[in-house]
Amino acid sequence: MRIILITGISGSGKSVALNALEDAGYYCVDNLPPRFLPQLASYLAEDGQDRLAVAIDARSSASLDEMPAMIRDLSRAHDVRVLFLNASTQSLIQRFSETRRRHPLSGSTSHDADVGLLNSLAEAIERERELVAGLAEFGHQIDTSNLRANVLRAWVKRFIEQKDSGLVLMFESFGFKRGVPLDADFVFDVRTLPNPYYDHELRPLTGLDKPVIDFLDALPVVHEMIDDIEKFLAKWLPHFRDDNRSYLTVAIGCTGGQHRSVFIAETLAARLAASANVIVRHRDAPVEAGESSKLVA
């Protein structure tokens, strides 16, 4: 059975991700106490189910301490993948304010003696970060701070389409003006390269469009940058693989995240596709098609 565990910070989009998995045919359970996960997996496997998705939050803090060992045990019999959703505190506060929802650890809703009474929203968010921090290393992290719901659904679809084993290498383009992705393991700044933005014909395009590709591909300095990043990753990827890392996110940043970073992320992904299971995502470029422009909430 393939088991997808969705965890992370409340308000970061776990419900959106779970709905996407339900649409993909997964048996979905929201806010399951972690201690019941092994029994649920066994029951569904006996019942013929081959895909399970479970969303877990920080309300059962005692059980969260047992999750790393539980994940290792489940992985012996099942294909277990962990999706860890994160977002900046500022984004989360704005989302809770807009939806008028109460954070699960704030005020009177927190009954866990280990958690205590958390009056401010910011305090509840930071406490939750501490409680779930141990799960982040087991999963593929996605920063949803500036992400729209339809884009998150598309990224979840790509996540579950990956091969069953091996290192997943994520190339993520972004714009520094919207902040560095929280999920990045490595960040490469390519703002020193010539910017197609200053060509009025190229400005509305992205690094996926042929005129922008031709512009950047003709510059030796661009290829020097790509070659250097590729050599660095080719050298160190085996070490991460030997360390049993399942996911590695390489963030490529330019000013707006539309031209240079997109082109370089795509080029690196093509070059390293034989070395790992590669995913590409473009956080800030308008290249993800979808029916909704609503931000993750």
UniProtKB/Swiss-Prot annotation:
<dbReference type="InterPro" id="IPR027417">
    <property type="entry name" value="P-loop_NTPase"/>
</dbReference>
<comment type="similarity">
    <text>Belongs to the RapZ-like family.</text>
</comment>
<keyword id="KW-0547">Nucleotide-binding</keyword>
<dbReference type="InterPro" id="IPR053931">
    <property type="entry name" value="RapZ_C"/>
</dbReference>
<feature type="binding site">
    <location>
        <begin position="57"/>
        <end position="60"/>
    </location>
    <ligand>
        <name>GTP</name>
    </ligand>
</feature>
<dbReference type="InterPro" id="IPR005337">
    <property type="entry name" value="RapZ-like"/>
</dbReference>
<dbReference type="Pfam" id="PF22740">
    <property type="entry name" value="PapZ_C"/>
</dbReference>
<keyword id="KW-0067">ATP-binding</keyword>
<protein>
    <recommendedName>
        <fullName>Nucleotide-binding protein Bxeno_A0336</fullName>
    </recommendedName>
</protein>
<dbReference type="GO" id="GO:0005525">
    <property type="term" value="F:GTP binding"/>
</dbReference>
<dbReference type="GO" id="GO:0005524">
    <property type="term" value="F:ATP binding"/>
</dbReference>
<keyword id="KW-0342">GTP-binding</keyword>
<dbReference type="Pfam" id="PF03668">
    <property type="entry name" value="RapZ-like_N"/>
</dbReference>
<dbReference type="InterPro" id="IPR053930">
    <property type="entry name" value="RapZ-like_N"/>
</dbReference>
<comment type="function">
    <text>Displays ATPase and GTPase activities.</text>
</comment>
<feature type="binding site">
    <location>
        <begin position="8"/>
        <end position="15"/>
    </location>
    <ligand>
        <name>ATP</name>
    </ligand>
</feature>
